Amino acid sequence: MSSIFKEGIYDTGSYARTGTLDLNGIQIQTPIFMPVGTRGSIKSLTSEDIDELGYNLILANTYHLYLKPGKEVFDHFQGLKNFMSYKKALLTDSGGFQVFSLASLFKFEDDGVRFQSHIDGSHHKFTPASVIDMQRSIGSDIMMVLDDCAPYGSDTKRLELALDRTHRWAKESFAYWMENPGGQNVFPIVQGGVNETLRLRSLETLQKIDFPGIAIGGLSVGEPRPEYIRILECMAPHLDKSRPRYLMGVGTVVDILEGVKNGIDMFDCVLPTRNARNGQVFTSKGKINLRNESHRLSDSPIDPQCECKVCKTYSLGYIRHLHKVKELTAFSLSTYHNLFFMQSFMEKMRKSIEIGNFQGFYDHWKNLFGS
């Protein structure tokens, strides 16, 4: 039984459920969406903004924080939370995915992965123990193990090799973490691409280890949505009910709907913040491109039904103008709105599960945001 998670209410027609995460006394209601503060900041927002928006759990990236500002800085400041004046809970990924996708060169070894920084070409090595040590210095409440995320389209041989590494490194990470767990938790990462047999093998292997939660990686990395849904559906009946389930890097409205329907509790993605900076915002009527000429004279808010301070204060026409002339305020206003939308969306989703109307909620939002 996970000591950090308490189940709530189950939807009778799917695997959707509510629950409560307890991370060192900070209560987080699930299903939850986590904004991404890759380098220790939610781009264009302050830590006060994040608190005002009601987010009790955010994500940061070990790879980027390891390179800049580095472990020494976090040891000096006693963690990222103190460094960025953030008071709530923090999750960090292990940095493995960024090594494979960003590093100019990388090479697998039995005990880890060597890579060159995408910033200056300097040489580094991640091992299961070193990424735990880095995340201890960051001070995250939930840490991730080092894993091997095979690219979408990999053949069975490559996927099996990734599973072997991922499982071996997960066991090493667990043993190392257990020497000094402190107040931090660590999740393993299920891999296997879009191969159902390998996904179930990975899930079974990792759930046999007494990790406090489980993460699912390697989805929403380029596969068609039917493949994404198929893998979620194959795993859903086998997910341990006592542990929180985290689907990594997933954050579109439709993908979250499919995830929750199949028992996922936690999501993160850069999409709401990145889209906001590019002039795309989410509303109760679907997506809006703020730069469209049709909004030039609009004195309406982004979303008349939205209660955020941006929609209560500024017109769509004004925010469009800020984007068109590339004012930095455009980024902060649009990002604030999108994260308010995501927080409200997840709150309404939890309510729909509690009152037995998840299917109606699912149908409504899927119709608005795409098939």
From Swiss-Prot:
The keyword Transferase applies. It catalyses: 7-aminomethyl-7-carbaguanine + guanosine(34) in tRNA = 7-aminomethyl-7-carbaguanosine(34) in tRNA + guanine. Keywords: Glycosyltransferase, Metal-binding, Queuosine biosynthesis, Transferase, tRNA processing, Zinc. GO terms for biological process: queuosine biosynthetic process; tRNA-guanine transglycosylation. Zn(2+) binds at C306, C308, C311, H337. Substrate binds at D93, S94, G95, G96, F97, D147, Q191, G218. The active site is at D93, D268. Its cofactor is Zn(2+). Pathway: tRNA modification; tRNA-queuosine biosynthesis. SUPFAM superfamilies: tRNA-guanine transglycosylase. Binds 1 zinc ion per subunit. InterPro entries: TGT, TGT-like_sf, tRNA_ribo_trans-like. Its EC number is 2.4.2.29. Homodimer. Within each dimer, one monomer is responsible for RNA recognition and catalysis, while the other monomer binds to the replacement base PreQ1. This is Queuine tRNA-ribosyltransferase. It comes from Leptospira biflexa serovar Patoc (strain Patoc 1 / ATCC 23582 / Paris).
